A protein has these predicted regions:
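Ligand-binding loop in jelly-roll beta-barrel domains
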Residues: 105, 118-144, 239-265
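Surface-exposed interaction/gating patches
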Residues: 154-210, 214-220, 227
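Conserved short histidine dyad/triad with adjacent acidic residue
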Residues: 48-55, 65-84, 174-177, 189-205, ...
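Short acidic-glycine-tyrosine-enriched beta hairpin
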Residues: 103-118, 223-239
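A short, N-terminal "cap"/entry segment at the start of jelly-roll beta-barrel domains
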Residues: 1-63, 137-186, 268-269
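Structural motif
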Residues: 96-98, 121, 130, 210, ...
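Glycine- and acidic-residue-biased ligand/ion/polar-headgroup-sensing regions
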Residues: 85-98, 102, 206-223
Length: 269
C-alpha cells in the first residue's frame, strides 16, 4: 500500500542506465536510485538514516524539503529539527512508533499523518520495529491576524477521498487539512487514480510539487516530456512546470503530494 525504498546496491552485472533525470523544470528520482550509499545521517537522530529527495534550490523549487526517514529499533530523536521556523508533516509508511508533541503522546502506524506547527516541541521514538516515514518541512509564512495552525495526528483511513467532478470515481484526493483553512500555507495530500484515470489537461500553476508514488504506475507529462513512473519514484516540480498523467496497470495509482498554498507571492527574489 505504501512503497518504501529497499536500499541495497545493484549487482556489478546490472546496467547503470535508469530513468533518473534533472531538467530546468522538473526532476525524476526513480526508486532504483535510492540506494544505501546515497543516504544521510541527521543531527540529534539515533539509529536513523534519510534519503533526501528535495531541498530548496534557487531557480528551481524553493519552498520545501522532503526526506524519507528510516528509524531502526531503539532509534529516534528528542530534538528532531534544528530550524526553529520549520513546520512539518510526517506520513508513516511502515512500522510503529511513539510521537510526542508538546508533551502529548501519539502512537504511530502505517497510514498515520502528522502535522507539527512551527514552534512546537516534538519527539519521536521506535522500540522494537523499524519505523519508516516521509518528513516534509517548510518555513511557515506567518501573517498578521492569522493564527498558527494547531498540531494534529490522524490516519488515512479516517479521511474520505474527495472525488473530482465528472470523473466517474477515477480521480480523487484525500485531504488532511480543510482547503478553506487559511492558516495553513502548505498542503500534503494523497492523490488516487483508478487505472485509466487521467489528468485531462496540462496543469500549469504557481504551486511547487513533491510527488512520491506510493502505489501503482502511470505515464506523466512533465513540461515537454512523457515519463513513465511507478511505485517508489519521486517527481520534483518547480512552479509552472506543465503536468498531466495517464494511470495504467491493474491497481490504483497513488501518490503523496506537497504543494505551497494560501499566501501572497513575494515580490523580492
Amino acid at each position: 500500500k505504501y512503497y518504501f525504498p529497499t536500499g541495497g546496491l545493484p549487482s556489478q552485472r546490472d546496467i547503470m542506465t535508469q530513468r533518473a533525470v534533472f531538467t530546468e523544470a522538473y526532476a525524476v528520482i526513480p526508486k532504483g536510485s535510492m540506494r544505501d550509499i546515497v543516504t544521510s545521517f541527521l543531527p540529534n537522530w539515533d539509529n536513523t538514516r534519510a534519503w533526501v529527495l528535495a531541498r530548496p534550490l534557487s531557480g528551481f523549487a524553493e519552498t520545501f524539503s522532503q526526506y524519507i526517514m528510516e528509524v531502526s529499533a531503539g532509534g529516534g530523536s528528542t530534538k528532531p529539527d534544528t530550524d526553529p521556523n520549520a513546520q512539518s508533516v510526517l506520513f508513516i509508511t511502515d512500522g510503529q512508533g511513539n510521537l510526542k508533541i508538546n508533551g502529548v503522546k501519539h502512537p504511530l502506524c502505517a497510514g498515520s499523518y502528522v502535522y507539527i506547527p512551527v514552534g512546537a516541541h516534538w519527539e519521536i521514538k521506535t522500540d522494537a520495529t523499524t519505523l519508516r516515514f516521509h518528513w516534509l518541512r517548510k518555513t511557515y509564512v506567518s501573517v498578521d491576524g492569522i493564527e498558527t495552525p494547531d498540531a494534529f495526528v490522524t490516519h488515512e483511513d479516517k479521511n474520505a477521498i474527495d472525488l473530482m467532478p465528472d470523473t466517474n470515481g477515477a480521480w480523487g484526493t484525500t485531504r488532511f487539512v480543510d482547503p478553506d483553512d487559511i492558516r495553513h500555507d502548505m498542503h500534503v495530500n494523497i492523490v488516487t487514480f483508478q487505472p485509466g484515470g487521467v489528468i485531462p489537461f496540462e496543469e500549469t500553476h504557481v504551486m511547487e510539487h513533491g510527488l512520491y508514488v506510493l502505489q501503482g504506475k502511470a505515464v506523466y507529462k512533465l513540461n515537454q516530456d512523457w515519463v513513465e513512473v511507478e511505485a517508489g519514484d519521486f517527481i520534483w516540480l518547480r512552479a509552472f512546470c506543465p503536468q498531466a498523467c495517464y494511470a495504467g496497470g491493474s491497481e490504483p495509482f497513488r501518490y503523496l503530494l506537497y504543494k505551497d498554498v494560501n499566501r501572497h507571492m513575494p515580490l523580492k527574489l
